[in-house]
Amino acid sequence: ALMVVKVMKIPEPWVISIDRTDWRFGKTVFNVLTLGVVHHGIAFPLVWIMLDKKGNSNTRERCELCNRFLEIFGDRKIDFLTADREFVGEEWFDYLISDPCTRFRIRIRKNTLLDDGQKQLRADVCFQNLQVGQSKVLSKPRLVWQHWLYIAAMRLDDGDLLIVATAHDQNRAIADYAKRWAIET
């Protein structure tokens, strides 16, 4: 991991991205949780965990991966972490928001309940009037998994909503989240 960073001369602050994927080699399937740094549109995996199970990761596994990353790269400046809809939940957000805080841009599901302090609405209801290509940031934070977070959304070309939760820099949330797709490279 240190060699990759040194050879690639990846400048700080870093955008890091967490993902889980299945790698198939013949009849063998490896379930891999990975954390990489995004550089020139490519996510370079720096740390990973082989999950001895099928399906999604849990908060303990994610925290273990992030802690391993911090052991190696704790002195580096991180701009933010991006993650897809799998990487949500109260304990996970507790970890990210704890000291030291990891700024994040995390996609949430359209059926996630957003609480404004008076009522709860599904995220997709809050953004139902968006047209393709339009984006919107809710003016005030919403309670999501016991944390007050800003919510931004954009209507994608296929009609789906891209909905992103963040605790910081909400007006950059959608553009920043786009860097997450690099982990798929």
Regions found by a protein language model. Name each.
Residues 1, 10-14, 25-28, 39-185:
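Single, function-defining residue in the core of a domain
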Residues 19-32:
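An active-site-proximal beta-strand-loop segment
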